[in-house]
């Protein structure tokens, strides 16, 4: 992937702004069909290499990269862990989101975000020299010249087939998790990667975080704590809260939480609460959960909101305030876009 995508990002006398557009487009759409964290991890060393060759400062290129990864995660069901958490909760009540349904809100946010950072937002991006003592693993360029062409082609074929299996889950009867496992197994069986390499690629931190927060979410639901919080939220808004105001409150609450917790943990924690709110009002749970997931993805203002943000702190020489300064305007933009689209595409009372 680094070899193929890197060739598309090559300099070709592009201006710095156009390079940011190219990076964000590629990262955004790759994050929609792969994991947003995985996409960022693959392309960070590519962008660092481009910065070195072009003479542009990496701090100006890496932050748009991780922001685009977060935005792109909202293009499909598999773009971010939070998307699947909401989907699992909906399936328990015989509802679901379509594979690309998140893109109804996510795609406009990505498009406007790209335009913003290529124009007005360009001026607020960090403009720092690379740290002199940076020894990040992402700074180490990997040589893919010895990788056989058949492995590159076969890996792409398996990726496409795996994605098709995920997209047509209902038609094939094969669950998302099974399709993903079959794709990974195919890579090992065909010799594209070894079993050791496959195991090394598994992020145990993410798995334990996912499992732990889902357990916490289940506890909130079974003990009635989720319902209690839901009642407090509804009570604070009055006997008959406006669906629009409630959508805004859920969205902002998830925005704030995701920047100080992980976005996955925020979604896992808020999903049962949002379900309780929807059921208490007799509203469509899909409307509340969409606001929860999109709000939970707005982890732009801190380096701890999502793993990709943390990955580039050292390489970009960023401070906490760099994220706040560059990311807060994007949160405002995402909020405005969401508050326009959500009530239309996902009404509380369809």
What are these regions (language model features)?
Residues 15-19, 28, 32-41, 84, ...:
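Transmembrane alpha-helical segments of multi-pass membrane transport proteins and ion-pumping complexes
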Residues 17-25, 39, 62-63, 103-107, ...:
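Hydrophobic alpha-helical transmembrane segments
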Residues 28-29, 50, 89, 163-167, ...:
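Alpha-helical transmembrane segments of multipass membrane proteins
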Residues 13-75, 81-93, 263-295:
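Hydrophobic transmembrane alpha-helices that form the pore/transport pathway of multi-pass ion
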Residues 101-231, 247, 330-335, 339-350:
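Hydrophobic transmembrane alpha-helices of multi-pass small-molecule transporters
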Residues 14, 54-67, 73-85, 89-145, ...:
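Juxtamembrane and boundary regions of transmembrane helices in multi-pass small-molecule transporters
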Residues 36-40, 109-111, 174-184, 235-246, ...:
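Structural signature of hydrophobic alpha-helical transmembrane segments
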Residues 1-6, 10-11:
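Single conserved hydrophobic/aromatic residue that forms the stacking wall/gate
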């Amino acid at each position: 992937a680094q070899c193929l995508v890197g060739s598309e990002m090559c300099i070709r006398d592009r201006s710095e702004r156009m390079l940011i557009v190219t990076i964000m487009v590629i990262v955004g759409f790759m994050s929609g069909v792969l994991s947003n964290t995985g996409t960022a991890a693959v392309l960070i060393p590519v962008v660092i290499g481009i910065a070195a060759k072009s003479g542009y400062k990496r701090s100006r290129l890496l932050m748009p990269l991780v922001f685009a990864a977060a935005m792109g995660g909202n293009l499909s069901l598999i773009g971010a862990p939070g998307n699947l958490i909401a989907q699992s909760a909906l399936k328990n009540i015989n509802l679901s989101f379509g594979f690309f349904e998140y893109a109804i809100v996510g795609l406009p946010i990505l498009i406007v975000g790209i335009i913003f950072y290529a124009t007005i937002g360009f001026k607020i991006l960090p403009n720092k020299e690379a740290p002199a003592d940076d020894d990040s693993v992402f700074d180490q360029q990997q040589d893919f010249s010895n990788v056989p062409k058949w492995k590159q082609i076969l890996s792409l074929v398996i990726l496409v087939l795996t994605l098709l299996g995920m997209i047509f889950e209902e038609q094939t009867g094969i669950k998302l998790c099974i399709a993903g496992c079959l794709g990974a197994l195919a890579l090992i069986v065909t010799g594209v990667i070894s079993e050791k390499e496959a195991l090394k690629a598994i992020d145990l931190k993410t798995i334990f975080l996912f499992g732990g927060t889902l357990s916490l979410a289940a506890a909130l639901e079974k003990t009635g704590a989720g319902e209690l919080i839901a009642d407090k939220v509804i009570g604070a808004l009055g006997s008959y809260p406006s669906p629009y105001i409630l959508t805004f409150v859920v969205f902002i609450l998830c925005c704030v939480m995701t920047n100080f917790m992980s976005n996955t943990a925020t979604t896992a924690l808020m999903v049962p609460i949002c379900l309780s709110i929807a059921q208490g009002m007799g509203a469509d749970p899909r409307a509340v959960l969409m606001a929860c997931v999109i709000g939970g993805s707005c982890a732009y203002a801190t380096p701890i909101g999502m793993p990709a943000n943390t990955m580039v702190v050292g390489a970009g020489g960023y401070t906490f305030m760099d994220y706040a300064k560059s990311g807060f305007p994007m949160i405002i933009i995402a909020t405005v876009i969401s508050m326009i689209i959500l009530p239309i595409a996902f009404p509380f009372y369809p």
